[in-house]
Each structure stands twice: as structure tokens, then as C-alpha cells.
Amino acid sequence: MSISLIQPERDLFSYQPYWAECYGTAPFLPMSREEMDILGWDSCDIIVITGDAYVDHPSFGMAIVGRMLEAQGFRVGIIAQPDWTNKHDFMRLGEPNLFFGVTAGNMDSMINRYTADRKLRHDDAYTPDNQSGKRPDRATLVYSQRCKEAYSHVPVLLGGIEASLRRIAHYDYWSDTVRRSVIVDAKADMLVYGNGERPLVEVAHRLAAGEKITDIQDVRNTVVMRKTPLPGWSGVDSTRLDKPGRIEAIPNPYGEDLPCATDDISIPEAKPITVRAAKPKPWEKTYVLLPSYEKVKADKVLYAHTSRILHHETNPGCARALMQKHGDRYIWINPPAIPLSTEEMDSVFALPYQRVPHPSYGKSPIPAYDMIRFSINIMRGCYGGCSFCSITEHEGRIIQSRSEDSIIREIEEIRDKVPGFTGIISDLGGPTANMYMLRCQSPRAEQTCRRASCVYPEICPHMDTNHQPTISLYRRARDLKGIKKILIASGVRYDLAVEDPRYIKELASHHVGGYLKIAPEHTEEGPLSKMMKPGMGSYQRFKELFDTYSKQAGKEQYLIPYFISAHPGTEDKDMVNLALWLKKNRFRLDQVQNFYPSPLANSTTMYYTGKNPLAKVDYKSEEVVVPKGDRQRRLHKALLRYHDPANWPMLRSALEDMGLQHLIGARRECLVPAPTLEEQREARRALRHHTPALTKHTSITRQRQPSNRAPAASAGKKAPTVANGTSSAHSTSANQSTSANQSTSAAHSTLATKKSAGKTGVNKAAVNKPSAGSRGKNRQH
């Protein structure tokens, strides 16, 4: 493999350990004063506040950060899921000598607490006994404020995925508004975004050396508040949609370049010596001035423009700093940190984790731990660039892989030490199962590329697609003594896998437990192009290879595809076509996911602005169709569960509105059955018992006439005929929305019908009819 041009200034473990190293390694990082006393500590140097239960396992952020800082010689305490209603629980371990580290946990607290439909969840997988309500909404903000109440002079550093994805002015789905950077609202001293090992270690050592937090402003992967740019940095003004321009230095009013008065003194002639300085890279010491918080809140196009810039500045090899005004100050976002090397990754995962929850939880189960206790993280990062996912903005595009030896040692440690191990490793993976050791083969391209995805619309020719390192790892792992099975539970990137069929054969032959999950997300080009996902051709090719190799291995195995409904760019006809594809392929999904607009994702920008940040943004640029209303989002979700009888009335109504009545019935190509006689009788019964209507005469009530009956004719006049081409069910619904006037005309009835159809939010576009369905046994878990 070629040597990367993206190199750190110093190794993660090259710092002189802090003096407290003499205390040694703690069995568990202390969560109480009693534990501190046992360790002989009079105080903590650093206290980590987290919204998750403390599990000493490398899949939990607080454990990695805590053990990493402990390895640098610092005394680290943890306050897990504190009582946030007052400051007292935040003073449990006393005042830290250096700083508080605040994180909401492994998940965004709002996503953890609410569903995609903004409904309150009643469980929390990161809490003992799966209890909900153990962390507040916007936990990062609340915890930070309580830390400042407890010890106002102690620096507060924000971290974790919640803070990371809120490092800039961002759209907040739950309040349906644009919020300021979380560092502003939390009144914190610094925000660490992404994986925090490198910046946290540097900041901790600089604070320990006596520097003030206000003087530490230039650390990569951090966000700070400033009134001016960093000294020596030049800026590019991108506050408007026109071509960005350089921010010129303010001229010296005293004219320092003007000639000075001199007496006629002869100066000896000297021959100049020319020394050519190294030409600086165009991104070095350069920042981009973004539209202010106030502007992006008021102008959706500027918001999309800002989002596009931020996503272009994620490559640590060439990213520029970003600067955005909030009121009378600016947030300063330093470029991303240099990724960890394989040796550094090995050292981080070799730290002395106990791999079990803290003893204070007793036997209370923690579902998130139960899910991962026998799994192993083999890499970080993802270059897929899916629009609805924020992994690139958090972990980066560059894959950071552990060595094979490091992974094998962890498997042996699980086998020998973790209670309850039965010989089955539940996962060898990461953000994606099959990106292990796959990096850009061109050092120059890796350093300078600003593409959002290395695999969309086509796989970059510089990208390595040789899966042999992964295959070798799988073979070595399953040959270990005491290991019965190695399963792969992480999602497989199938467009990469088809480039190396050997991997698919290895996977199907040895590492699938009956079902393999993959995520095509949709079948139609419209939404797929906005998601930046490959077309169904790659899926079909992968399925053919998977089925072939499964059959050769004598195994009955199935693919479980995952889909997203109501994603920006999805029209109703797209969801109907997806439902027909599911029916044709005999899939019946048990659980479906509506699009969830999480902070900083490109898809969230589309959802909020109606603009496409994947292309150049201006006031005339592409408008994106966004399914927003509750009714349309429910419809899209219902189409994924076309087989559920509870959804049939809604689907029938929508199909009629779209002019797709031919999809209602008992024929093979139909999506939903026609209403039964009992359902029709129930509908008529409901009409007869609707609420009475008041006339203009007070206290006099009368029933509306059934809407499918012509109004009574006046004496000597012929009753008007109502022309209505819709079905009886739709006509009934439409006519109920007309006024209570008993002499409603045919024109009024027709108008009401059109209005009712317009409220459904559906599109009257043609839908491809499916061919005869396959007889596979695929089904959803």
C-alpha cells in the first residue's frame, strides 16, 4: 500500500505522561468518592459527564476517551446519567483539576428519546433495564450548563456525536427551526467534533502544562468562539451565493511602505541572495467565512449553500477552517484531525477495558451492551457518503483499520475473559462491513479530493476494491480454537462487494446466520440520486452471487433489504413502485423507517430548504420534492407495509386519488384488495351516524343528506345530476367536505371532490406494473 501524505505532527502516544501516572490503572474508572478513595486519589484531573450508562467497552465513547486519557497519566472519573435537575450530582466527584468532558452519549439525545414522527420513546437501550427518561432533551446543552453552575471557572469541553453534528448553525427537526451552534447555547469553552482521541490528548497536555483554555485555539477537530480570525490566517468570503472572494488585509493608514526621508548617504551595493521558500498549499492557513447564523436562519438558500461548503471541507488533507458569525462573535471550526494510523488504532483498542458494565449496575441488563458484548470493531470511517448519514462528518471518509493481529488478540480476550461467551462472535465490522483496509491508492488524490462519495455515482478508479485483507481476517478468526462461528452483522456495501466476488463467496459460505442485511434504501432513481445510493442493478448482481454461493455451500440463506420512506426526492409514485417491487419479490417488512432529519446530514438540508446541496446552490437551482406532512409521511410508511390490513383504507384512497384504481383488487398485479362487503357496510353505517349540522336558525338541527344521494328537487323542477368519476368511497369523502346547504349544485360537488383529492399530497404519475412475482421465501425479521 502506498504511503499516505496525510500525516500527524506527532504520534498519539508520544507525549510525556502526566505525573499522576504513578497511580497506575484503575479497574474501572471511578464513579464515586468511595472508589476514588480506594484508588488513593484526592481529586480527578478530568471528569467525563455522559448520558449513557458506563460500560467499560471500546464500543462506548466514554470508555475509549477515559482509558485513552488514563493512558496519558491523567486521573479520569465518570459521572454517568446524572440527575440534571440541579447541580449537586455534577459535584459528586469534586472539582476536576483540568476540565469537564461532556457528551450526550453514543446517540444523539433527541434521536434516542423521540421517534421519526416526534413521538416519545418508552425505552433507552443505553440505560440499565432499558428505562427511558434517564437523560434530558438536548443533554449536551443541559449537562454543560450544570457543570458551569457547579464550578464556573472549570473549562467545559463538549464531545460526542450530538455536539459533533451541532457544531455549526443547524436545522433542528424537533423544534422545526434553525438553532445556533451548540457551543454558543451551552456556553462551553471548546467543542471537540468527530473521534476525539487526538485533540483531547493535545488539549489535556497543554492545560496540564499551564496554558489557559482561552489560549488553546488552533487544535484540529475543535471548535472555539472568537472575535477575529486566528493571526496569520487569510480568509475567503463565502457569505453570498456569488463567486467567493478573498478577504483582503486592512491597509495600514500610516503607509508603512512609503519611502522615508534620508540624507544622501551612500549605501554599498549588495548582491541579493535568492532563497525560494516552499510554496504553501492553497488550503493552508486559510479559512472560509460562512453566512452568519442570522442569515441562514432567515434564508433557506443560504442555509443550503452553507451546508454544501461544510461538506466540502471534511478531508483532513485539504480542509480549510470555517468561520461563522453568531451575534457579535464567531465560531471558529478548525480543520479535521489527522486520522489514526493502524499502530495508533491498535494501541487505542489494546487499552485495559474490562468489557463489562460498571459493577454499580449489578445484574440490571443494558440492551446496548448485550448487543455488542461479543462484537469487534475492526475499522472506522466511511466513504460511502450517503446523504441521510452523518458518519463522514463525524468519523471522516478515510478508513482507519486495525491490524489483523490486534483484532485476533481481541477475539482471544473475549473468548478467555468475557462471561457468557458461547463461541460465537456476533460481528466483525464497523460503519460498513467490507471497507476494512480499503483506501485510496493515490496519495495525492487522497490528500486533495473533495468528493462527497468515493463510490457514487461510480466507484472511483483510485479506490482499492481488493477484499483479500478482509477474507484473510475472516479465515484466521474462524480458525481460532474455541471459536464456533464468526457472524457479520454490519451492513455490507454491495456495490463494493460485487467488485470482488471472492468476498461474497466467503461471506455466504461461512459468515451468515440465515439472513444478511443490506440497505438498498429504495428502488427508484429519483430518491436514490438524492440519497447517493447505487441503483438496483448492483443489488440484483449481489443477490445473484449471494444465492449462487449459498446454494453451493448447501445453505438456505436470504437477504434482508432495508428501505427508507419519505426521504427527500421521493414522490408518491416512487413509493408505489417500491411497494410493487416488494410484493413482486415477496417481501413483507415488519419494521420500516421513515426518514429522520438528523443534524448536519445533506438529506436534512434537502428536507428543510427544498434545495439540493449535492450540486451548486442558488435561488434558481434544483428544487427537491419533500414529503413533509404527517399524512404523506404516514402514507409512504404504509406503502412499505402494503400487506398490513390496517393500512388498506389509506392505500385505497391514495391509489384512487392517483388514478391507480387498477392496483386495487384480487388480481396478482394488485397492491391491496378491494374492500369487503363488511367494510362497505361499515362505511355506509358511519355515514348514517355522522354528526348533525346546525342551520342558520339557532337551536334547530337536521341531518345532512347522504352525500351519495342527489339533493331533493323543488316542486316543478328536475333534480340536477352530479357527474363524478371517482369511486363511491372517494365521492363520499369529498362531498362530506362541502357545506351543509341541502341544495348543493353539481358544480360545487365536483369542486369539493377536486379539493379533497388535492389534500392527499399524491402525484398522478404512471406506475410500472410488475411482472410475475418470484417465489422466493425472503422475508423481514
From Swiss-Prot:
Gene3D superfamilies: tm_1862 like domain. The keyword Glycoprotein does not apply. Binds 1 [4Fe-4S] cluster. The cluster is coordinated with 3 cysteines and an exchangeable S-adenosyl-L-methionine. Residues 696-708 have a biased composition (Polar residues). [4Fe-4S] cluster binds at C382, C386, C389. GO terms for molecular function: 4 iron, 4 sulfur cluster binding; catalytic activity; iron ion binding. Residues 726-750 have a biased composition (Low complexity). It comes from the Bacteria. Signal peptide: none annotated. Disulfide bonds: none annotated. Pfam families: DUF3362, Radical_SAM, Radical_SAM_N. Residues 368-646 form the Radical SAM core domain. Residues 681-781 are annotated as: Disordered. Keywords: 4Fe-4S, Iron, Iron-sulfur, Metal-binding, S-adenosyl-L-methionine. Its cofactor is [4Fe-4S] cluster. HAMAP family: UPF0313. Belongs to the UPF0313 family. PANTHER family: UPF0313 PROTEIN YGIQ. This is Putative UPF0313 protein YPO0674/y3502/YP_2990. The lineage of its organism: Bacteria, Pseudomonadati, Pseudomonadota, Gammaproteobacteria, Enterobacterales.
